[in-house]
Amino acid sequence: MKGMFFCARAVVPFMKKSKDGAIVNVGSIAGITGAGSSMPYAVSKSAVHGLTKSLAHALAPEIRVSGVAPGAVATRWWAGREEKMKSMIGSLLLQCIAEPDDVAKLICSLIEQESLTGQIITIDSGQTL
């Protein structure tokens, strides 16, 4: 959270000078749904979403600020948790979890969107639907 704030504070003057720019913060669906099993994590991700929306208000119209809220992503974290992953996938509308490239492509598309700011976009195979 602090890292995102300080990073934005460092780049905003340069973006304002060029009258253009986009910031995309990465949170989590836990910041939207909450997570009783990991309350500090969920609270910190909710703060990321709040920072994103506040920056969007403060920096418009020159700078667009959006956020991505991934659900489960196929990473090394799942090693040794194959049964848990299989169970989770079975509960998702799309019956799959995102690949890291899926998240990266979404971030790139948000950077290119000239008419979008202040939004938190989930990429969670329908988990929060």
Swiss-Prot record:
Record-level Gene Ontology MF annotations: oxidoreductase activity, acting on the CH-OH group of donors, NAD or NADP as acceptor
Pfam families registered for this protein in UniProt: adh_short_C2
SUPFAM superfamilies: NAD(P)-binding Rossmann-fold domains
Domain of life: Bacteria
Gene Ontology BP annotations: fatty acid elongation
InterPro entries in the record: NAD(P)-bd_dom_sf, Sc_DH/Rdtase_CS, SDR_fam
Family the UniProt entry places it in: Belongs to the short-chain dehydrogenases/reductases (SDR) family.
Protein known as: Short-chain dehydrogenase/reductase homolog YusR
Organism encoding this protein: Bacillus subtilis (strain 168)
